[in-house]
Amino acid sequence: MSFVKMTGSGNDFVFFDGRTTPIDLVTQPEAIKAICNRYNGIGADGLVVLEPLQEEADVRVHYYNSDGTAADLCGNATLCSTAISAQWGITSASGMRLATGAGLINSRIDGLPAIALQPITDIRPDMPIAPATAQGRRVGFAVAGIPHLVILCEDADAVDVAGAGPALRRHEATGPAGANVNWVSPRPDGSWRYRTFERGVEGETLACGTGAVATAVLLRSWGLSDGATTTIRTSSGRDVEVDLEPLTAPDGRSLEGFRPTLRGEGRVVFRGEIAGL
């Protein structure tokens, strides 16, 4: 079976073309774990199958975490899906509609892939979690397709992500499914540095697209970012950009929430064949 290995700012994925790969074959939990294994498999944070559609969208994005569980959305995987869908000729680079578990996403390639996520309205600037316990100064929550804790701290690079992440990822305040956990701190140039502990990977990843979106939303809610675009440095050293458009009613009234657009890398690393599962 043919595959493509892709990366979005260090968040890496194994992609399959649903036109030539039986979806059921590669999306069994044990198959996903084997393919994503970094020692005996290809190695990745997640697995994606792209299935061309005819009506409600151009492509359905089937996304799975490396532990074999399905997820409604992965921002960096969606950026990569945008790039490879155009390369495979499934869609046009100038605009495409991607069906995800978190709703329809419009995307395009304009230098870098850019995806317009569904509006974010579940925003909680203060969570009932002691900031000191979370190694930060303030703890907020937002659902950017999937749930995220965002923790404002002095220096994200000094945080013990591996030590603090597991308990926070399952904190009762985030609900039964838990949440990804993001730590964010300011950089001298006005951008931000963040690190993420991801559920489903159960460890730190080099980048998290929806985490960057949730982080930008909380920074705006906390009054720490007032520009249209928030630039966030990932652990791979690459930047992602998040644009936030305040929601408005048809009559012009302001509504609670934002309409986000995420821009970032979606790059093919290598192509190959799987000998067997």
Swiss-Prot record:
It catalyses: (2S,6S)-2,6-diaminopimelate = meso-2,6-diaminopimelate. InterPro entries: DAP_epimerase_DapF (IPR001653). GO terms for molecular function: diaminopimelate epimerase activity. The gene is dapF. SUPFAM superfamilies: Diaminopimelate epimerase-like. Belongs to the diaminopimelate epimerase family. Its EC number is 5.1.1.7. Substrate binds at N11, N65, G75, N76, N180, E198, R199, G209, T210. This is Diaminopimelate epimerase. Catalyzes the stereoinversion of LL-2,6-diaminopimelate (L,L-DAP) to meso-diaminopimelate (meso-DAP), a precursor of L-lysine and an essential component of the bacterial peptidoglycan. It comes from the Bacteria. Transmembrane segments: none annotated. HAMAP family: DAP_epimerase. The active site is at C74 (proton donor), C208 (proton acceptor). Homodimer. It is found in: Cytoplasm. GO terms for biological process: lysine biosynthetic process via diaminopimelate.
